Each structure stands twice: as C-alpha cells, then as structure tokens.
Amino acid sequence: MTNTSLEVIGYVRCDYKEKFGIPRQSGLTDCATAFIEILPPYNQAEAFRGLDEFSHIWLLWDFSKAHKNVFATRSPFRPNNNGLSSVKLLDIIYNKENGCVHGLVLSGADILDGTPVYDIKPYLPYTDSHPEATGGWTDSLDVPELSVRFSDDIAAKLETIFSSTQIEALKEILAQDPRPGYQDEPNRRYGMLYGGYDVRFTIEDGILMVCEVASAHP
C-alpha cells in the first residue's frame, strides 16, 4: 500500500474552537467568517492571480482532530482525514511589505480553528453545480430552525465581546441546533466554545435560550 503525503499550504483561523457547534455543512452560516493564513512558499501573489474573479472556492482540508470510520456520511469519522468544503471568497489579503498573499477571507466555512488546508480550487458553477442531484438519505432531513433568545443582560454582554457580524453568526449557528442528533434533553444545559467564550444554553419547545456567556480562559 502506497502512502501519500500532502503539503499544508495554510491554516484556518476562525471562531470555532471545538467540534461541538460547528455547522454540519459549509454554506449554512453566511455571517460566519473565517481566515486562511497562507504559508510560504505558497503565498506568492502569482499563484492567486485571477482567483478574486470567483465568488466561491473549494477547500481541501485535514480532519486533524477527528476519528476514523464510515464513507456514506459527510461526518468527520472517515478513514482518510480529508474534508472538502465550498465556501464564499470575500477577499484576498496581501502583505503590503512584500506583496505576498497573507490570507483569504471566507464565509460559510464549517471548519475548526487551526485546521490545516491542503489545497484551494475555484468553484465552477457550470460543472460543480448539479440542481438535478439527489441527496440520498439527506433528502428526508429537516433543517432545524430554533428561535434564539437572549436576556437583556446577555445581549448587552455579547455586544461588549463580539462584533455585530460575530453575534449574527452565533445566532445562525444556534438556530440550527448545534447538539448531536441523539441529545434531546429539555432540562439539560449545553455549552459550546465560540470566539474564546463558553456559550451555555437550554432548548425547549423549539426555543433556544442563551443563559450564560463566560470566558473560556478565566
């Protein structure tokens, strides 16, 4: 059996600090932004020329903190630690001193902070989009739409911690019910790490109530 090595061209920097709470697929949270820090020697401006003409790109990345298991899902439990995501390209940031690419600004990513990236390719609508495609077992899934609520105190605290864009992204993530499908306990308090903070909440009768926001590094 031949082993193949992949070169890391960059790392993801975002507010998702753990797997719990990351969107189940890319493109589900338009407000959530991420940054790919491009490493030398792959940061040469010539390599990215023309990429800004594309609205979306493909990312090939590493499930560096995942386990291994099955093929018939899009979950991180796979025999090869590779993930594939289509994301919106918002901007390309250049280093003013040397003209090299510092990184890419994205939205709609479903990737953990610190994840290695192996490759970037433009999304081609005329070949990559298939409106007639069937989704197998996912065709019967209902996308959760919870009502997200904050107390006045929590809302005020969030405004001192996060930008308005980060708050909207947090609402989008929570509205999609970040819990695993097997966890549905009305009296349980759940927690997820977001932007360096522990966001705790309860869910009952379709309402997600954020009850606490505390620093993850007291």
Explain the meaning of each model-derived region.
Residues T2-V8, F77-V87, G195:
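Short coil-to-beta-strand transition motifs
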Residues M1-A45, Y123-E172, G181, R188:
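Arg/Lys-rich, positively charged N-terminal/basic patches that mediate binding to nucleic acids
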Residues K17, D91-L104, I111:
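Short, conserved beta-turn/loop elements at beta-strand boundaries and strand-helix junctions
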Residues H102-T138:
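Flexible glycine-rich active-site/ligand-binding loops centered on an Asp-His dyad
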Residues V87, E185-D205, H217:
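Basic/aromatic recognition patch in beta-strand/loop cores that engages polyanionic ligands
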Residues E46-G83, Y182-P186:
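Active-site-adjacent substructure of cysteine-protease-like catalytic cores
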Residues L112, E204-P218:
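Enriched for short, Lys/Arg-rich terminal
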